[in-house]
Amino acid sequence: MNILAGDQSTSLIEPAALRAWAQDRYIFLELTDGRIVGFPADRFRILRSATNEQLKEVSLRLNGYALRWESLDEDITVPGVVAGRFQLPLGEEFVARVVA
């Protein structure tokens, strides 16, 4: 879908992921619009209990619009992550580190 504003056309297509990786219990995404976003694995119930090795098994599905962990049987949408829709709140220890 496009919105025309004067002579400019702005795309409203949500960005997809070009690649995904896990590092230090964070999941990172490189998006098609050039951004790199990351989130703590502990923001999702199944990922919270996963080992570091299991987290590293992340793969892209649906042309970069979904993340998949086969051994965990877990799928997460990239647009949901980009919009900040997580299952669990930030842990107190994370908030304390950021505030300090």
Label every model-predicted segment.
Residues 1-100:
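Motif-centric detector for short Cys/His coordination patterns
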